[in-house]
Amino acid sequence: MYRVTGEGTGTEEFSKLVRGDKVRILGPLGNGFTVQPGKKAFLIGGGIGVPPMLQLAKDINAGIVQTPGEEKNSGQAAMEGAEIKTAVCDMNIVMGYRDENTFLLDEFKEQAASFVATEDGSVGTKGNVIDAIKENALEADVIYACGPMPMLRALKAYAAEHDMDCFISMEERMACGIGACLACVCKSKDV
């Protein structure tokens, strides 16, 4: 999933592709989440961080996530035909959008109880994802989140205030994709 971000961009080039066109892709890059089995989880996505949380929800329900102490690619083994486990934890999904231009709502509802916050109140709770958590009296032991930096900072503070574990995935622009050019460096203390 992607959004065309302007003229002359890579996303515009993607939008012009048709079935059968060939492209070279480097990925996936980065690290996934190590899921804590048995802990009630919030899966929280905002903006470009929404789609990765759908895949995490699917993986949790299929039992193909990496859990503490497992080998790094154990989830991949399950996807390639190993025995499929059951869901590793209960979860509530909370998604944040600017306005009514939401996406993937039906797909999230197929995975778990799903809640929406929009900045303008056009869908779900008016405000941010924390407002949706409070309005719906949701509780969890751990947060897995992906999205814009202000949302991640707020969730980190919320987790500390509620004595919860919090794992975040930062979606930042990256040039080379492997860390060589240092364009993707994020100061973790700023999150």
List each model region and its residues:
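Ferredoxin-reductase
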Residues: 1-19
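Short, Lys/Arg- and Gly-enriched loop/turn segments at beta-strand edges
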Residues: 10, 30-39
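Generic structural signal for buried aliphatic residues
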Residues: 22-25
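Short, charged beta-turn/beta-strand-edge "cap" motif at the junction between a beta-strand
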Residues: 27-32, 190
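Extended interfacial segments that mediate partner engagement and assembly in macromolecular machines
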Residues: 28-30, 42, 47-53
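Short glycine/serine/threonine-rich phosphate/pyrophosphate-binding segments
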Residues: 50-56, 151-154
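Intrinsically disordered, low-complexity terminal tails and inter-domain linkers enriched
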Residues: 62-89
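Reductase modules of NAD(P)H-dependent flavoproteins
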Residues: 75, 80, 94-191
